[in-house]
Regions:
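Short, flexible segments with low predicted structural confidence
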Residues: 23, 144, 182-183
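Short strand-loop junctions, especially beta-strand C-caps/beta-turns
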Residues: 152-154
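Catalytic domains of carbohydrate-active enzymes, especially glycoside hydrolases
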Residues: 8-24, 214
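Active-site-adjacent loop and "lid" segments of alpha/beta metabolic enzymes
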Residues: 1-9, 28-56, 61-65, 71-72, ...
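Phosphate/pyrophosphate-binding loops at sites that engage ATP/ADP/AMP, CoA/4′-phosphopantetheine
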Residues: 14-15, 55, 133-146
Length: 239
């Protein structure tokens, strides 16, 4: 990971209209290998320091030590794909620092999550999980108004699970917290037409606009300018 390239990319995303930059030093793609805290910090530290004055910065990590250093460096949101399960110190850190927290649903871990995931009703199960994690976070002292929820599109879910979550996203609104959705370039898009990740812009736009229409509050995307334009046009059409 080249910090200079990451900083330049972050600055370009801000220029395109990004309001939050999510910085991570450990891949959470299916099959990704774990990275130790020292290496993770080496990757993200300079990037956060350079970008924190230009936009709101989120640190994508499940390690409390990495999150603490990132917050010291200027990040103000912790995006934890394990929903506070990965490190026993994470909940207390987030409570003590009074920062925003994103809690995401994931079955297993990035190395195992796509190994034949099975649900009875994926929406009901994801909703129950997020409700339980929200309760735990609040019980640990994290202010409820600082918590955002992410159903984890593509994390331990089949193509049909992802589509079902997007169709019924409105059912998660009853949890009472902002919803974060990330569909950008994900494999469920390619499963529709066989497109590689580099050719999934159309599917990213379609799924992002539909997610927003169903109640998503925050969209995590690679193609900020294009998705932003699509959202503005959709808003204009809908009045």
């Amino acid at each position: 990971m080249d910090p200079d390239a990451a900083i330049a990319h972050g600055e370009e995303l801000v220029a395109q209209g990004a309001e939050i930059l999510d910085v991570g030093g450990e891949s959470t793609r299916p099959g990704a290998e774990a990275v130790d805290a020292e290496e993770e910090l080496r990757r993200v530290g300079p990037v956060i320091a350079a970008l924190a004055g230009q936009a709101t910065v989120s640190i994508d990590t499940s390690k409390a030590s990495v999150a603490e250093a990132a917050l010291d460096g200027g990040a103000s949101i912790v995006n934890d794909v394990t929903a506070l399960r990965g490190d026993p110190g994470m909940a207390g850190l987030c409570a003590d620092r009074g920062v925003g927290v994103v809690l995401m649903h994931m079955r297993g871990n990035p190395r195992t999550m796509q190994a034949d995931p099975v649900y009875g009703d994926v929406v009901d199960e994801v909703k129950a999980f997020l409700a339980e994690r929200l309760e735990l976070a609040v019980g640990a002292g994290i202010a409820e108004e600082r918590v955002w929820l992410d159903p984890g599109i593509g994390f331990g879910k089949t193509r049909e699970h992802n589509f079902e979550l997007l169709r019924r996203l409105g059912e998660l609104r009853s949890l009472g917290r902002p919803l974060v959705i990330g569909t950008s370039r994900k494999s469920f898009i390619g499963a529709v037409d066989g497109s590689p990740a580099s050719e999934r812009l159309g599917g990213t736009i379609a799924s992002s606009v539909l997610a927003a229409a169903e109640g998503a509050d925050v969209l995590r995307v690679h193609d900020v300018a294009e998705v932003g334009q699509a959202m503005r046009v959709a808003a204009a059409v809908l009045g």
